[in-house]
Amino acid sequence: MPHVICEPCIGVKDQSCVEVCPVECIYDGGDQFYIHPEECIDCGACVPACPVNAIYPEEDVPEQWKSYIEKNRKLAGLE
């Protein structure tokens, strides 16, 4: 399962996650970064790099941020 960037990223966009991603699947989505779900290899390198704890494995996204799964897919052009 891919990782998902959620609400805490909005307005922060620290780029630490971008720098550690080995497959460069994290992109600028305007107000936040997003992870392309078809490019993510599920390595998890981005999770500890995020200073605002905005990144989760898709299956572990907190209930209040479940909409970010679809938002990441839309930003990636998959919906």
Swiss-Prot record:
Cofactor(s) annotated in UniProt: [4Fe-4S] cluster; [3Fe-4S] cluster
InterPro entries registered for this protein in UniProt: 4Fe4S_Fe-S-bd (IPR017896), 4Fe4S_Fe_S_CS (IPR017900), 7Fe_ferredoxin (IPR000813), RnfB_subfamily (IPR050294)
Q: Which Pfam families does UniProt cross-reference here?
A: Fer4
Positions of the 4Fe-4S ferredoxin-type domain? 2-30, 31-60
Give the note describing cofactor binding and stoichiometry. Answer: Binds 1 [4Fe-4S] cluster. Binds 1 [3Fe-4S] cluster.
Q: Does the keyword Metal-binding apply?
A: yes
Task: Kindly state which keywords UniProt assigns to this record, in alphabetical order.
Answer: 3Fe-4S, 4Fe-4S, Electron transport, Iron, Iron-sulfur, Metal-binding, Repeat, Transport
Q: Which GO terms describe its molecular function?
A: 3 iron, 4 sulfur cluster binding; 4 iron, 4 sulfur cluster binding; electron transfer activity; metal ion binding
Q: Which residues bind [4Fe-4S] cluster?
A: 21, 40, 43, 46
Q: Which domain of life is it from?
A: Bacteria
Amino-acid positions noted as binding [3Fe-4S] cluster in the UniProt annotation, renumbered to this chain: 9, 17, 50
Q: Which PROSITE patterns match?
A: 4FE4S_FER_1 (PS00198), 4FE4S_FER_2 (PS51379)
Looking up SUPFAM superfamilies in the UniProt record yields: 4Fe-4S ferredoxins
Briefly state the protein's biological role.
Answer: Ferredoxins are iron-sulfur proteins that transfer electrons in a wide variety of metabolic reactions.
Query: What is the protein name stated in its UniProt record?
Result: Ferredoxin
Q: Which organism is it from?
A: Thermus thermophilus (strain ATCC 27634 / DSM 579 / HB8)
